[in-house]
Design a protein with these regions (language model features):
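Residue-level detector of anion-binding/catalytic polar loops
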Residues: 50, 80, 139
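Non-catalytic propeptide/linker segments at domain boundaries
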Residues: 80-111
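N-terminal, post-signal-peptide region of Sec/Tat-exported proteins
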Residues: 34-73
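Bacterial N-terminal signal peptides that target proteins for export
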Residues: 1-6
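N-terminal signal peptide c-region/cleavage motif recognized by signal peptidases
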Residues: 14-15
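Helical hinge/lid and interdomain linker segments adjacent to catalytic or ligand-binding clefts
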Residues: 22-32, 62-72, 115, 119-188
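Short amphipathic alpha-helices in soluble, non-transmembrane regions
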Residues: 70-83
Length: 188
């Protein structure tokens, strides 16, 4: 019995001693909380840790160097993850690098500064974009006409307008959708 416990303990520690990556799968059935997973990716970038975004691999999974704090944050937020060894990570990247496969590794290095084009006084649950960002725990600023006119958009890496679904819902309910002369989503 003692040998079995010692062998089990040894295998457990061996598994984690060679594990150096966290794989956050994004495929359906594997990821418990897709929005929170995006929030984890943003949080990691805020902490100056590079992420490899595996486009078209298991739903666009994220590959991150292993840190205990990242693993703990995944647990706290209810995000599914796998701890894998460098060898496994390299095998995944080899599969992705095949020119016959429509997949790619994109390195993410900086958390973008995000703004949402929405009027003051709107609550996060009033529009789908702010609701999603709030739930995912991704920080954003609200901007509206006065910020646009005063040329403050250059402070942001990403500007997202109100969701079209919200406009359709307003029309369905007999309300006037927000009126703007220009419809835009600006990626700076």
């Amino acid at each position: 019995m003692y040998k079995f416990i010692s062998l089990t303990t040894l295998l457990f520690f061996f598994k984690f001693s060679i594990a150096s990556k966290i794989l956050i799968p994004m495929d359906n059935g594997e990821q418990n909380n897709h929005l929170k997973a995006y929030g984890i990716a943003y949080w990691v970038l805020q902490n100056d840790i590079e992420i490899e975004w595996l486009l078209n691999y298991r739903g666009g999974s994220f590959l991150i160097d292993y840190f205990k704090t990242i693993e703990e944050e995944c647990i706290i937020r209810g995000v599914s993850y796998d701890i894998i060894a460098d060898v496994q990570a390299n095998q995944i990247k080899t599969i992705i690098s095949d020119p016959e496969v429509n997949q790619q590794v994109v390195k993410l290095q900086k958390a973008p500064k995000i703004a949402v084009y929405t009027p003051d006084g709107k609550q996060p649950w009033d529009d789908a974009v702010t609701l999603v960002l709030s739930y995912a725990e991704i920080p954003y600023d609200k901007v509206y006409d006065s910020e646009v006119i005063s040329d403050q958009l250059m402070k942001y890496d990403w500007l997202q307008e109100q969701d079209d679904e919200d406009k359709r819902e307003a029309i369905r309910l007999g309300l006037d959708p927000p009126k703007r002369k220009n419809k835009f989503t600006l990626y700076l």
